[in-house]
């Protein structure tokens, strides 16, 4: 059964496996509809999308319109200035066919200059606060990629009391001692404050490099069912964090199935074995 946990201070009892709707960036409505039926069968009750995810918000709209009460709904703005971010939030609501989203997130906020702009006077954070005051959003979060993101999120929590954070977490990346230490510091801070921690890139195998891109993801995902099981169970085996699913509807069913069968975290030896067998590499260095 899909495990659930309270999503930080929001109070929502979310499935620990969150649907990463980047998977809907470039699919037909029929493909999106079949995927949404799959989510309902597995009991997933939390969706994470973004304004920059192609057609994702548009594909979600018809379903959200009919099933709004069944999902915690999050989107993101990648704009860095207040008015541009506010306008994008309003467009996201229109595309999603809702009057309010549960969570708005400042998208991929890692670059120091962009960070200062977004969190400073006239920045995107002001738009998120305004949207919350107007009832367009309920909570505010921050997301990011890369090896510095955990440290940047810790800094962000000193600047503003964000409700959620989102960042990479997988076995290869946590072998980087600096990133691992930064992640642990962030996680401790989030636990103190009741901040929900979402994680991405659980089933990353490696960067595409020169290999043909055979999935919708911008990294090469694991395909072997045993490897996917171990990667997913390794993430879910860490208490207090959520797993946002892969951005490819073809790989998604294996991730959902693995999450549904989660019982315990694989051992370090088991993860080292699968990492070697699959030639897993960190996506960010």
Indicate residue ranges for each PLM-predicted region.
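N-terminal binding-site loop/beta-alpha segment at the start of enzyme catalytic domains
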Residues: 1-71, 127
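Conserved, mostly hydrophobic/aromatic
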Residues: 7, 19, 47, 60, ...
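Acidic (Asp/Glu)-rich catalytic clusters
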Residues: 8-11, 40-41, 61-69, 90-99, ...
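Short, well-ordered coil/turn segments that N-cap beta-strands
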Residues: 12-17, 43-45, 68-72, 98-102, ...
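Short, acidic/polar
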Residues: 27-40, 82-97, 147-157, 226-232
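Beta/alpha (TIM)-barrel catalytic core signal, keyed to glycine-rich beta->alpha loops juxtaposed to Asp/Glu
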Residues: 55, 109-285
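A short, structured active-site edge motif that brings together acidic residues
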Residues: 70-81, 103-107, 167-169
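Active-site groove signature of glycoside hydrolases
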Residues: 93-116
């Amino acid at each position: 059964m899909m495990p659930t946990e309270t999503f930080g201070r929001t109070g929502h009892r979310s499935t620990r496996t969150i649907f990463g709707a980047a998977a809907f960036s470039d699919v037909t409505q029929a493909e999106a509809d079949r995927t949404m039926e799959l989510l309902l069968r597995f009991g997933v009750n939390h969706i994470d999308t973004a304004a920059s995810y192609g057609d994702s918000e548009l594909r979600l709209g018809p379903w959200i319109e009919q099933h709004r009460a069944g999902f915690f709904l999050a989107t993101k703005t990648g704009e860095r200035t207040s008015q541009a971010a506010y306008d994008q939030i309003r467009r996201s609501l229109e595309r999603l066919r809702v009057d309010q989203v549960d969570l708005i997130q400042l998208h991929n906020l890692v670059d120091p200059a962009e960070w200062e702009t977004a969190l400073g006077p006239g920045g995107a954070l002001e738009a998120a606060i305004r949207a919350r005051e107007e009832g367009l959003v309920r909570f505010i979060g921050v997301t990011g990629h890369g090896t510095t993101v955990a440290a940047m999120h810790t800094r962000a929590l000193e600047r503003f009391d964000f409700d959620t954070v989102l960042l990479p977490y997988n076995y290869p990346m946590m072998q980087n001692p600096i990133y691992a230490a930064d992640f642990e510091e962030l996680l401790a801070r989030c636990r103190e404050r009741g901040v929900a921690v979402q994680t991405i890139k659980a089933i990353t195998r490696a960067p595409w490099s020169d290999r043909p891109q055979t999935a919708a993801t911008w990294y090469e995902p694991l395909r072997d069912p045993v490897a996917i099981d171990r990667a997913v169970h390794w993430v879910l085996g860490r208490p207090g964090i959520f797993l946002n699913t892969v951005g490819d509807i073809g790989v998604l069913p294996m991730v959902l199935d693995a999450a549904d069968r989660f019982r315990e975290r694989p051992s370090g030896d088991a993860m080292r074995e699968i990492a070697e067998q699959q030639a897993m590499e960190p996506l960010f260095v």
